[in-house]
Amino acid sequence: MAQSVLKTVIARYKTILENQNEWIKPSFKKPQYDLVWNRDYSLTQNCFSINTLNGRVKLSYFSDGMSKYFDYTIYKFGTARLVNKHGKYYLHIPVTYEVEESNISDICNVVGIDRGINFVVATYDSKHKSGFVSGKAIKLKRANYSKLRKELQMRHTPSSRRRLKAIGQRENRWMQDINHQVSKALVENNPKHTLFVLEDLSGIRNATERVKTKDRYVSVSWSFYDLEQKLIYKAKQNQSSVIKVDPRYTSQCCPCCGHIEKSNRNKKIHLFTCKKCGYKSNDDRIGAMNLYRMGINYLANSQVPNTVVAE
């Protein structure tokens, strides 16, 4: 137990040093305990055996919807974290298992995925089918969260600060659930050995900070990275792969004739009209089509600049 405490404190200091511009003294307000599998905790006879200062205790548990992960022949338990939340104890257990890696030669389907705000994702696949997940309801709900947050910030009371924190956590959980649903649908609606092609949005925060102030909250805080990470690990589970490519000109290039021009895209009405061949379509769909084309080029060993294979 002493070793677990030491490692937790060191990890918190490292996080502060890596993420903060100035030094902030770490605080530990919520009780937590990191447990190493087979040393600090184990699972026997449908009970968890947990090491404490007063010896090992056996505890019954509830695992609704998670029972499949308790098959030791498939899943391997990692270092768990015991936390107390609203008077109840939760054991967060990371599990790992081996999956077959997907080889490029096995790829049978390519899906270009354009991420955005009006549409969470727009897709285009090898069957030349397009798909859209609307972001309208998400934008509306996040706007309501933002309005409520501003009202609470003006009160400057202990209760308003507590509620602010709770609202932030609730919004984060809700957005993570949305990303889980979207990434799960993308993987399940496509066969094994699919290549998903995303834009490399590493610099998205710097770009979105140049938008109008009234739109900045939505643009900067949109969880593109979280969706990306969830898609990567779900794709691996389905023997599929994810690559990230240079996003330049994906919304300005005509997928039919290859003509690139900034005025091809009308952002206000979300319409792409090629000035050369006249091809018209939704601008997000155009982005997905161009990402699909870059995926095909990648498989054909053609030069696709700045391609990153997601790990």
Where are these regions (language model features)?
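Nucleic-acid substrate recognition interfaces
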Residues: 1-311
